[in-house]
A protein has these predicted regions:
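Short, small-residue-biased leader/transition segments that mark boundaries at the very start
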Residues: 2-5
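Conserved nucleotide-sensing/catalytic segment adjacent to the nucleotide-binding pocket
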Residues: 13-29
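Switch II (G3) loop of P-loop NTPases
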Residues: 15, 39-54
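Inter-motif core of Ras-like GTPase G domains
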Residues: 55-78
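Internal gly/pro-rich beta-alpha loop/helix module
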Residues: 82-191
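Glycine-rich phosphate/diphosphate-binding loop of Rossmann-like nucleotide-binding domains
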Residues: 197-233
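Helical hairpin unit composed of two closely spaced alpha helices linked by a short loop
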Residues: 234, 238-241, 278, 284
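Cysteine-nucleophile active-site neighborhood
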Residues: 248-290
Length: 290
């Protein structure tokens, strides 16, 4: 798919909140702008709660503190039980700038297993909100930079199955109650530009790692058109061509076989065309990929 799993699950394009790339004020403004009209805002963390580029700088915990939202932990309970008590206690008390309101356990073997985990929650002072059982029908293999979801994967059926499981074992109503906060973000409306540039962005199964806000900024600078290095035969006329990251290495035969697109890109670059390429997009511009 050309969309992320978070987009598919929500039915709405997600946005990145990144305190390394953006200022604290901009992070708050993004949250306010995109979240104001929503019934529920879910901030999906990355790696561990406190993992950042320098200590907890840039971490999910820092973002939670910046925008003032509570934290629900998702904790792997595989091959453990009461030992989660000190782990939970540490999460709750390690940093006073965030508020841990509950936990959902993953990889729970049985109802009896969950009972041990609930006792640990009581003693650690963290509310147990439910669990996800061990179930092969809701497993997605992981790979570098995310989950392994290809064009053969039926996400709608998978999401329905996950919802069915969660409805039975997670107290969603209580989770939403604990996470209800006053929405206090201020929207600035962003920067308004009236540029007349034409910007072509590569977007298909091979190239789809891009920040939504970057695309919106390009739209304010001019007209944005999308094209597919996999399927299109020619490059759109453009003042700038943007090749975002993705997984071109998974589509090498198709990309290599699209001679018309390859030659069009080469000619554009060699005649002084402006190009922005990131990660997989930069790989595509190389002579070879090994």
């Amino acid at each position: 798919p050309t969309r992320r799993s978070s987009d598919l699950a929500a039915g709405e394009e997600s946005v990145n909140l990144d305190s390394y790339m953006a200022s604290a004020a901009h992070v708050r403004e993004l949250y306010a702008r995109y979240g104001a009209a929503s019934d529920v805002c879910v901030m999906e963390g990355v790696m561990g709660l406190f993992d950042g580029y320098d200590g907890m700088k840039g971490s999910s915990a820092e973002i939670a503190e910046l925008i003032g939202i509570p934290v629900v932990l998702v904790l792997n309970a595989k091959s453990t039980a009461y030992t989660v008590a000190p782990v939970l206690y540490g999460f709750k008390h390690f940093y006073p700038g965030i508020r841990v309101v509950g936990v959902v356990f993953n990889f729970v073997a049985s109802v009896a297993h969950y009972a041990y985990l609930q006792q640990a929650c009581v003693d650690a002072g963290v509310e147990a909100l439910g669990y996800i059982p061990k179930d092969e029908s809701i497993v997605i293999p992981s790979r570098h930079l995310g989950l392994s979801i290809d064009e053969t994967f039926c996400f709608d059926a998978f999401a329905d199955r996950v919802a069915e499981v969660i409805d039975k074992t997670v107290n969603v109503d209580r989770l939403l109650e604990l996470c209800t906060v006053e929405f206090s973000g201020e929207q600035t409306g962003g920067v308004i530009c009236s540029g007349n540039r034409k910007i072509a962005i590569a977007r298909d199964e091979a190239f789809n790692f891009m920040y939504r806000e970057n695309v919106e900024a390009l739209k304010r600078a001019g007209e944005v058109v999308f094209f597919s290095p996999l399927h299109d035969k020619r490059l759109p006329d453009a003042d700038l061509v943007y090749f975002p990251g993705g997984y071109p290495e998974l589509h090498l035969p198709e990309l290599a076989a699209n001679e018309g697109m390859r030659q069009a890109v080469r000619k554009y670059c060699e005649t002084g065309g402006r190009v922005l390429a990131e990660c997989g997009g930069m790989m595509y511009l190389c002579d070879t990929i090994t």
